Amino acid sequence: FKSINDTYGHLYGDYVLEEVSRIISKNVRSIDIVGRYGGEEFSVILVNTNIKDCIPLAEKIVKKIAKKTYLKDGIAVNLTISAGMSGFPVHSDSIRDLIGKADKAMYQTKLKGGNGVSIAE
């Protein structure tokens, strides 16, 4: 994502983040929580949902983000994301640990080439 900001500027980068946020928000339930966590990272809390039931949803969101062309002011960019998931209480009962495990899972996705989803071990 840094390359988008460096190439097209932060205003365009912000536009892309807003569009990604919209895609995520449109694909989760109203009781779920979507938030930006850090520069270009998002956290999604799927309330009362088994982690195995989250996989198809996460894969759907990853595909929708990759399918969209982010077009503004004559600039068109396509992007992919790497997602990592952890579940309460399966992987931990600590928010800090859950975020850390989801982060490690995200890096596993990146090591596999990105544009996908991995679950914490």
Describe the function of each predicted region.
Residues 33-36, 77:
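A short pre-motif secondary-structure segment
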Residues 3, 33, 116-119:
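Conserved beta-strand positions that form and line the central face of beta-propeller blades
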Residues 55, 88-120:
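Catalytic-core segments of nucleotide cyclases and related cyclic-nucleotide turnover enzymes
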Residues 26-31, 63-75, 106-108:
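Short catalytic/binding micro-motifs of nucleotide second-messenger systems
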Residues 2-26, 35-39, 43-44, 51-59, ...:
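Conserved long alpha-helical elements within nucleotide-processing catalytic cores of c-di-GMP signaling
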Residues 45-54, 73-76, 81-98:
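Catalytic strand-loop-helix junctions within cyclic-nucleotide turnover domains
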Residues 38, 81-87, 119-121:
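A general secondary-structure junction signal
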